[in-house]
Each structure stands twice: as C-alpha cells, then as structure tokens.
C-alpha cells in the first residue's frame, strides 16, 4: 500500500522517521502492571510509532482551521485505568491492546495480535502505516456491524 506524502510529512513533524526504534521497556512495564498482555505486534508498533503527538491541521470550506490531536503516548492514553476499561472482544476475535488515542483523546486506537488496527468505532487499517494514513487523511472507518475478519 502506498502512503500519502501528507501522512509521511505529519509523522515526521511528530518525530517519526524510517527505522525508528525507541526504548519501550517503561511503557511495557506500565501496561503489564495494569493487566495488559503486551504482544509482539504492540511492541513493534510502540517501538516505531510510540510517544508521538500528531497534530493535523484541517482547513474547512469556510476557511476556518481546526487541529485534530492524535497521540501514541501510552501513559496519556491509559492514565490511571487498567485493562478492564479497554476491550473490543465483543467485536473481533483477536486480542487487542490500546496504543493511542485519536481526535483529542475521544477515540481509542488499538492494535491486534495480527497487526490490524482498530478505533473504538471500527477497523482502521491492516497495518500501522495504512491505519495512520487513514487517520491523518480522515478516510472512512469500517464500522463494527460491517467488519468481517
């Protein structure tokens, strides 16, 4: 899948670069202490895309501007909550873990054990870059009652 230049630009502004691999040991410990199983796809995502603040400016047809704030800063996403507050098991047959929050912390972002990403409202991408491209470009989400897989 080809990723848009806008998505690459927004990710780079947030501190991402190709081959990025940050130390996630404190975040893994933080998550495990709260009852989360931190599987390999989540670790891989956090190493490359963790601890980013992605602020995307949108210009409306009337010329006004709005900023969509997205974060992959795990402690900001989880806060004082534990794993019992984050689940998609009613919607998919795959383990998930929260790895971000979208639209000013209004919607959680999850990664599954199979590397697919989901918003709390539905599927958003089959891999991290596809999901981030869909989020940054505000492409549609496949809502739960239509999701298969």
Per-segment meaning from a language model:
Residues 125-149:
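Compact, glycine/acidic-enriched structural inserts
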Residues 117-120:
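Short hydrophobic/aromatic-rich beta-strand segments that constitute the beta-sheet cores
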Residues 105-110, 122-132:
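Short, surface-exposed beta-strand/loop "edge" segments at domain boundaries and coil↔beta transitions
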Residues 1-105, 149:
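A surface-exposed partner-binding patch
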